[in-house]
Curated annotation (Swiss-Prot):
It holds the Pfam family Aconitase_C. The lineage of its organism: Bacteria, Pseudomonadati, Bacteroidota, Flavobacteriia, Flavobacteriales. It comes from Christiangramia forsetii (strain DSM 17595 / CGMCC 1.15422 / KT0803). Catalyzes the isomerization between 2-isopropylmalate and 3-isopropylmalate, via the formation of 2-isopropylmaleate. This is 3-isopropylmalate dehydratase small subunit. GO terms for molecular function: 3-isopropylmalate dehydratase activity. The gene is leuD. Pathway: Amino-acid biosynthesis; L-leucine biosynthesis; L-leucine from 3-methyl-2-oxobutanoate: step 2/4. Its EC number is 4.2.1.33.
Length: 205
């Protein structure tokens, strides 16, 4: 997984609440096995009409908005527990999603796939939307080590919470297996010490 330490970029504002996983990636596109291929169908039914033509007023189809940070309304990622929703957002090119609340399962799936969910208070979320509406080139910075998100032009910032284990994994670019592998030497030493006390022959370790 790619390391995530800091990120400063422009923002794509999706001003909609209760965005569920079927809206993020419709069920008919879940048969694919390549994670990278899901990006093309992100918000498929909002991005394209029944003829496959782009819906011009949808935010992902507007050239004035770009960037690797998705700004979303409250209760993002609700609905079914499909991991494909996180895959689609990540495959499209987003590295972080900012909202005032995330569904728990979506939040876990996002973190497991290297996508950072940044949960802020409703008041700060409103400030973010206002800043982007005022200037679509506004940049937002996210410092994972400091657990801070900041509006660059005004300097206004807010802290956000993240599980310490998931934070370590993101900063180091680890998935669960990578994290375990990184601890093998410490595990081996612990087992050697433990087995030594129990008089277990070293060659069995």
């Amino acid at each position: 997984m790619e390391k995530f330490i800091t990120l400063k970029d422009t923002v794509v504002p999706l001003d909609a609440e209760n965005v569920d996983t079927d809206q993020i990636i419709p069920a008919r596109f879940l048969k694919a096995t390549d994670k990278e291929g899901f990006g093309e169908n992100l918000f498929r039914d909002w991005r394209f009409d029944k003829n496959g033509d782009p819906i011009e007023d949808f935010v992902l189809n507007q050239d004035k908005y770009s960037g690797s940070i998705l700004l979303a309304g409250n209760n993002f990622g609700c609905g079914s527990s499909r991991e494909h929703a996180a895959w689609a957002i990540k495959a499209y090119g987003f590295k972080a999603v900012v909202s005032s609340y995330f569904a728990d399962i979506f939040k876990g799936n996002a973190l497991n796939n290297g996508l950072l969910p940044v949960q802020v208070c409703p008041e700060f979320l409103t400030k973010l939307f206002v800043a982007i509406e005022k200037d679509q080139n506004e940049k937002i910075s996210i410092d994972l080590e400091a657990q801070k998100i900041k509006i660059e032009s005004s300097g206004e910032s807010e802290s956000f919470d993240i599980d310490s284990y998931k934070k370590t994994c993101l900063i180091n670019g680890y998935d669960d297996i990578d994290f375990l592998t990184s601890k093998l030497e410490a595990i081996k030493k612990f087992e050697q010490k433990r087995r030594g006390k129990e008089n277990v022959p070293q060659e069995t370790i």
